[in-house]
Swiss-Prot record:
MF annotations from Gene Ontology: rRNA binding; structural constituent of ribosome; tRNA binding
Protein source organism: Oenococcus oeni (strain ATCC BAA-331 / PSU-1)
Family membership: Belongs to the universal ribosomal protein uL16 family.
Keywords: Ribonucleoprotein, Ribosomal protein, RNA-binding, rRNA-binding, tRNA-binding
GO cellular component entries: cytosolic large ribosomal subunit
Gene: rplP
Name of protein: Large ribosomal subunit protein uL16
PROSITE patterns: RIBOSOMAL_L16_1 (PS00586), RIBOSOMAL_L16_2 (PS00701)
Amino acid sequence: MLVPKRVKYRRVHRGHMRGEAKGGRTVAFGDYGLQSLENNWITNRQIEAARIAITRYMKRGGKVWIKIFPQKSYTSKGVGVRMGNGKGAPEGWVAPTKRGTIMFEVGGVSEAVAKEALRLAMHKLPVKAKIVSKAEASKEVNA
């Protein structure tokens, strides 16, 4: 599972998820990518589930690139704990993903296999997404 090796601060502010992604909008490594259409947090477990779905469908063929990393911790208080007394303990890790971000890329397989693998991964994620080719993604950024 993806987790940071070390962080400067264990607890971070929630922050805002407004607007579109500034970077990471092009398919850089593979031939096809999975592009987010919504702003949301994606947990390390969801990323891992999507990765497994892609690799199992491709059956050792091709290559997968994960373009998002869960670097932000989220906290929660225990059940039955009263309000106050500080922020809760770190619960897990999330990757804040904005609209337009390429989350996964695949290469080295046919178009049909790549699209089906990414479609399966889409169902594991909490955001609406679309499958884009290298040419489509670069056209959108330049427009």
